[in-house]
Structure formats: structure tokens, C-alpha cells
Amino acid sequence: MIKEYNEIVLLVDKPKKGLMRGDVGIVVEIYDNHEGYEVEFMTKEGKTVAVVTLEAHEVRPIGNKDMLHVLELELAA
């Protein structure tokens, strides 16, 4: 079960938010008995890229067998 402050993996692209399937975020709020989540996506330095409300089917918990990769972003100054 996903808990507040758990890392999650995005299962769908969210191009309007600059997010892609596989991006990792942190759950900052849980809605309606785990039907939805508020998730923050950030850079390694802690700069917020996006905060998005997602439905349960759009995320999954990050697992011990998951391998992370790096995507360089061009953030507005």
C-alpha cells in the first residue's frame, strides 16, 4: 500500500506537466481511501518540477528491483 512520503513510479505520460512514464515522485497527500494521490516530482537538488494529482491506476510503489535513470531537464530560471 502506498503511504504518505513514499516514492512512486508514474505509469503514464503527462506531457503537459513535463512528466514521462517511469518518472519517480513523492506522495505528499492521499485522497479518498487511496483512490488518488498528490505527488511531487523534483530534481536531485530538490527543485520542484511538478506537483500533480494522480489516480491510483496512474502510479505504483517503487520496488527494490527498479532501476532509476537520469533525465536532464531545462528548467526556467
Each PLM stretch: what is its role?
Residues 2-65:
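Basic/aromatic-rich interaction segments and small domains that mediate binding to polyanionic partners
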Residues 64-77:
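Long, low-complexity intrinsically disordered regions
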